[in-house]
Amino acid sequence: MAKFDILEDLKWRGAINQETDEEGLRKYLAEHDDLALYCGTDPTGDSLHIGHLIPFMILKRFQMAGYHPVILIGGGTGAIGDPSGRKTERTLQTADQVKHNEECLTNQMKKLFGTENFEIRNNAEWLGKLNLIDFLRDYGKFFQVNNMINKEVVASRLENGISFTEFTYQILQAIDFYHLNKDDGVQLQIGGSDQWGNITAGIDLIHKLEGADRPAFGLTIPLMLKADGTKFGKSAGGAVWLDPEKTSPYEFYQFWINQDDRDVVKYLKYFAFLSREEIEDLAEKTEKEPWKRAAQKRLAEEVTKFVHGEAGLKEAQMITDALFSGNIKNLSVTQIEQGLKNAPSAEAGSEKKNLVDFLVDTKIEPSKRQAREDIKNGAIYVNGDREQSVDFDVDPSSAFDGKYVIIRKGKRKYTLVTIK
């Protein structure tokens, strides 16, 4: 049986930007079944967002093809900060912040990668033991300052200034690759396009210390841009986080289901674990029947299930279906808060109030005349029920959990009214 060509699959998915030695890597994959690869992330926050997820999708694909992924948590480098992609110096974190973030990221990675054929390492294990004299003697002599300055990550910062701390980051990342290659048999490093200089520095160090024939490869992924030219990964509300406390499964699902037709096939190739045939079928449906949004729905299903599990996906779909149909009575308060987090909101007192006055006082309607007209025309719903009587009283005692009255105007214009 022919071995699955992981590199060819990644190329078809548009997931490869640069490779240090494509021929050498292909040869290694053809002759060995034991490839180990890694991608690092510094614990600068307590959650990854979907922009961070991009390189780890590549690791996941290698894992599914039978190879051994290693996630490197930068407990050592995270105390310094990667200058890549930044115009200014990072604010240094406390040891307690770094430790807390390490624990959070480790838990997220375990959810994504499981427990088999996968490991998490922390570069504090070796960098934390490295003293200054050993650093300069054993590693510093292999790095030429003129070469370091010419690397894009440093060159882009020279005009505004870069500290010695961040300047040496590429050496520390090179030591990481060297350590994992020598002691753990890791041959391939994956990173974003801005990591090219750091990756090649690591390969150079490995070859200088272990010999030019030592297998060591690098692969970077392209910068992902939307069809409008803006950077992928942000919603109107900011970053889309993997932590359900920061971005609920519903919000996460909505981010994917609202993707542009021009982008959705690209994202399916990258983020969904679907075959070429399935993706090509969805691409055809998008071209012929874009209004059905079949590709967006499948994309949202696949990525939400990967990050939040089957339960998270089902909850996101339940909230979506309820808000779309207007049948909101079976939603819990938590689900209502998720689904209407970004909807218009208002406050009202705890006393009964005529619906016309309620709509005007909460600024859902601009005037009593307009309120009466919309009520009579059947455009107003209170807690899921259509109300067509101008004499109807809104009773806060029937609010969801005694807390919320939900007004829908028209098909899907919701307002969340909090009872005070």
From Swiss-Prot:
Protein name according to UniProt: Tyrosine--tRNA ligase
Reaction catalysis annotation: tRNA(Tyr) + L-tyrosine + ATP = L-tyrosyl-tRNA(Tyr) + AMP + diphosphate + H(+)
Motif ('HIGH' region): 43-52
PROSITE patterns assigned to the protein according to its UniProt record, in alphabetical order: AA_TRNA_LIGASE_I, S4
GO cellular component labels: cytosol
Gene source species: Lactobacillus helveticus (strain DPC 4571)
Annotated compartments: Cytoplasm
Pfam families from the UniProt entry: SYY_C-terminal (PF22421), tRNA-synt_1b (PF00579)
UniProt keywords, alphabetically: Aminoacyl-tRNA synthetase, ATP-binding, Cytoplasm, Ligase, Nucleotide-binding, Protein biosynthesis, RNA-binding
